[in-house]
A protein has these predicted regions:
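C-terminal catalytic core of tyrosine-transesterase DNA break-rejoin enzymes
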Residues: 265-298, 302
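Active-site/catalytic core of tyrosine-dependent DNA strand-transfer enzymes
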Residues: 215-271
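N-terminal core-binding DNA-recognition domain of tyrosine recombinases/integrases
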Residues: 26-131
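Conserved tyrosine-mediated DNA breakage-rejoining catalytic core shared by Y-recombinases
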Residues: 180-220
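DNA breakage-rejoining catalytic core of tyrosine-based enzymes
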Residues: 127-150, 208-219
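Basic, Lys/Arg- and aromatic-enriched nucleic-acid-binding interface segment
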Residues: 144-175, 282
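A short, glycine-centered helix-capping/turn motif at helix boundaries
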Residues: 167-180, 273-274, 292-294
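N-terminal DNA-binding module of tyrosine recombinases/phage integrases
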Residues: 1-40
Length: 306
């Protein structure tokens, strides 16, 4: 499918929206209107989500064709939304909209090509369930910054988890940037352009193929260098890592914010570092956004409660 994001979601809306379609027909597998939508309000709500998804995929995955969306893209998009600690209702709306997108793509293919294409976005329900169980959704805005992150890290039960958390805390990496690190990702010691202090550089490739440098404390970098003398890969299990953080927080009487809490803490601390070195608030937001592999400065503001 070609055209702008808005044009493509319009085409999909035409495929799935039937004004006046009866409810009994929309739930009848043998009816022409099966799984169609008839509410203008709901259709607009879902299309807004589709537009947001399309812009996300265009920015992060360089994907411009809705017909090429697959399960991996849906997984990444929901993970991206969970980063910002959404409300339960908002995440449920996104998941419902993505389910209807699957239906719309199938109907569009049937109309255009005479046969349905195989789309399966069922992972969205698993992501929603996981987010609820792990308390990654909120009833409103909730700051996920750790007040004493070092205490948490020092008390983690696994040394590899400690290293991963330190990289997230001091480098702002996403979880997928620390669960697997290869030897050739180490790029040496450099100078932090803001503080003018020495830092270790790790090149990470995160969801969507975004490649960029993560700056970490020299002692963490040296630990990795020594580790790679004996192993080609530093690898941890994400679920075990997240569980270790959660159990450690509960044991210490600290509210757990998951692995991403370290990334939130990095954002807040890094903005302050920029300002301490003479940068304006707006310059700090943009600089930190780039370091966190975002383009828009406004995204960093979310981590600060803005």
């Amino acid at each position: 499918m070609r055209g702008s994001v808005y044009y493509q979601t319009g085409q999909l809306t035409e495929a799935i929206f039937v004004e006046g379609a009866k409810k009994e027909d929309r739930i009848d597998p043998d009816h022409l209107h099966y799984k169609c939508m008839a509410s203008y309000k709901s259709m607009k709500t879902y299309r807004d989500v589709w537009n947001n998804l399309g812009n996300y995929l265009k920015e992060h995955w360089k994907l411009k064709d809705f017909e090429k969306i697959n399960e991996e893209h849906i997984d990444a998009y929901i993970s991206y939304k969970i980063e910002y600690y959404p409300s339960k209702q908002y995440l449920e709306k996104i998941v419902s909209a993505l389910g209807k997108l699957e239906d719309a793509l199938k109907r569009f293919a049937l109309i255009q090509y005479g046969a349905e294409r195989d789309y399966d976005f069922s992972i969205r329900q698993n992501k929603l369930h996981y987010a609820k169980v792990q308390k990654l959704v909120a009833n409103g805005y909730h700051n996920r910054v750790y007040q004493n992150p070092v205490q948490i890290i020092e008390n983690l039960s696994n040394d590899h988890h400690k290293v991963a958390a330190l990289i997230q805390l001091y480098g702002g990496a996403r979880s997928e940037g620390v669960t697997l690190i290869k030897k050739d990702q180490l790029k040496g010691i450099a100078i932090d352009p803001i503080t003018k202090e020495e830092v270790g550089i790790i090149e990470t490739k995160e969801k969507g193929g975004k490649i960029g440098d993560v700056m970490i404390r020299p002692y963490v970098y040296e630990w990795l260098e020594e580790y790679f003398q004996y192993d080609e890969r530093f690898k941890i299990n994400y679920q075990a890592y997240a569980d270790d953080i959660r159990q450690t927080c509960l044991r210490l009487g600290i509210e757990p914010h998951g692995t991403h809490g370290f990334r939130w803490t990095f954002a807040q601390n890094r903005v302050r570092i920029y300002q301490d070195h003479g940068y304006t608030y707006e310059q700090a937001l943009q600089g930190v956004s780039w370091e966190m592999k975002h383009f828009r400065a406004s995204i960093t503001e979310h981590y600060l409660g803005g």
